Amino acid sequence: MEQIILNILEALRCGETVDDKALVKLIHAEARREGADKRDLAKRRLLPFYQRVKREEPARWAGWNVDAELERQLLQVLRMKPRRTASGVATITVITKPWPCSGDCLFCPNDLRMPKSYLHAEPACARAEQNCFDPYLQVSARLTALSQMGHATDKIELIVLGGTWSDYPQGYQTWFMSELFRALNDDAVASVAANPMLARPGISRAEAGRLLDDAPADALPPVVAERRERYRAAGIATDEAELASGVAGEQERVDVAVGGYNRAVRRLYGPGTPWGEVAEWQAATMEELERQQRINETAKHRVVGLVIETRPDAVTPQALTLIRRLGCTKIQMGIQSLDQHLLDINERRISVAQIERAFSLARLFGFKIHAHFMLNLLGATPDGDKRDYERFMTEDAFMPDEVKVYPCALIEGSRLVGCYERGEWRPYTEDELLDVLADDIVVTPAFCRISRMIRDFSSDDIMVGNKKPNLRQLVENRLAARGDGATVREIRYREISTAGADLDELTLDEEVTYETPVTRERFLQWVTPEGKIAGFLRLSLPDRAFVAAHADELPTTPEEAMIREVHVYGMAARVGDQGQAAQHHGLGRLLVERACQIARDAGYAHINVISAIGTREYYRHLGFCDHDLYLQKEL
């Protein structure tokens, strides 16, 4: 292992490019020389080895003569999955525990090991289950993996999934958020011995779970070891066979429509069960949460974005106020369709009017809106889906900031199976699906980001429907073949990603403006001559008359503008590190200054920013002061 590191360092000193192809050659050559299994020298093991030597054997590390610049280059070579932090932050996704759902959609999976709509084989769900759905344990596991893969973890976006957030008891919501912050504040990073999938590449997730249970105590952060033992003592299983057998009887009844998901979840996770026992201590006060938030303002791992998901009918002023106090900055909202007939026959139990109100409220509260939109629902057609999506992107009541657009897939146990067997629903052909998605990308405006085109379902879980994980690539190939690639404006297609940006070539584009029923929106973006995006800001100028008329529901006054998002792209740089990527070169500050000027010129007396907990210090340095749910600056 050491010799490979030394060979990489020598190549870098000589000015050679060490890309993945060159690294594989170095690994294979060393494996042959040592007569070793090349899996034992895999890329994913090199960085943890380097980090361990630097931390535990300083004399040995000093002999390698690695200065700061050489180390930066080395880490760039050894970093696993660089796309993970290409958007500028490191993302950690966590899953809440199974809980009764206020909806019962026709297409929704009913996996009793998971919260509604999720499957236990999805990567984030499998990790959550191995960690007893505990927020502290989940963050520790992901923080460990990201650190050992070489990613900067100073800036974290937390994504909390699990269906409708507001369905959970308020005490659980507060506890869950408090534990997320606590894990980051504690720097709960385990050693390689506590990350079996890294130490032994290729093993199954189930085997990794068993190895983790046997990890030496000193390999785990103290709270992790204590918490895992607490769940074990309560009888919470993490073994795959136990997990499957524990729900088998109830799952069989749900799959054949004898009883329902909610009834079964109450029996499996309610009072009188091991989960009912641990629920007694899964609660926290708002004061405890706020203490963890204050610590996180200057912590090593700061929360720069916090996301929950919900349904439009659960979006109320009261719910949004609580969500904001918890520290949230973005809401994922299941829309699925704007066709009321489709919503009804797919049993969504929501109306288009509720969707409109949810969007207006979320905007006025300052949240970023990340919508879920589905194709190929029961009753849908390709042409109808195209019209529906275009309406979603262009009608002023909607126009989300971000969207997941993905095709409906048939999952065993969902009530859609009966429709399929009766011939009432069929999946689109690949050609139909690519045609719809290609049209959808083209009509997506410059202020919107298409974050996903597929769910993270395993192909084994999909009975019929798209099973190709590279669907987005196929769609982009279709666009290129049609000659439409140059017309794509959506954000993800234009991100500078892992590439650097020539700051001298960037210009501030202020041309993207649009109106909603309650705001005038300004989308400011730093762009390259080729149209690539290096950073952006979302500015909302609320309708003064509307805000005044709804003063009892809203946390702001008619004289307050709102910055809903500031984001600078490029490989995530550590706080204070002046790297080559676009971050930390004042682009965000310039965006904020321009937004303040626009709001001032429009006659607003104050401007709010929906700051994440970990960005409060940044905005204070820009002249903002704490003001109830936001940070505020006088104009």
Where are these regions (language model features)?
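Flexible, acidic/Gly-rich N-terminal and inter-domain linker regions that tether
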Residues: 1-138, 142-282, 446
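Conserved non-cysteine loop/helix-boundary elements of the Radical SAM core domain that shape
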Residues: 120-138, 158-182, 196-370, 374-431, ...
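C-terminal scaffold of the Radical SAM
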Residues: 184-185, 277-283, 314, 318-324, ...
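Non-catalytic positions within long, well-ordered alpha-helices that form the structural scaffold/packing
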Residues: 324, 393-396, 596, 600, ...
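Conserved acetyl-CoA-binding loop-helix of GNAT-fold acetyltransferases
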Residues: 579-599
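Conserved GNAT acetyl-CoA-binding A-motif
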Residues: 597-611
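Conserved active-site alpha-helix within GNAT-family acetyltransferase domains
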Residues: 611-630
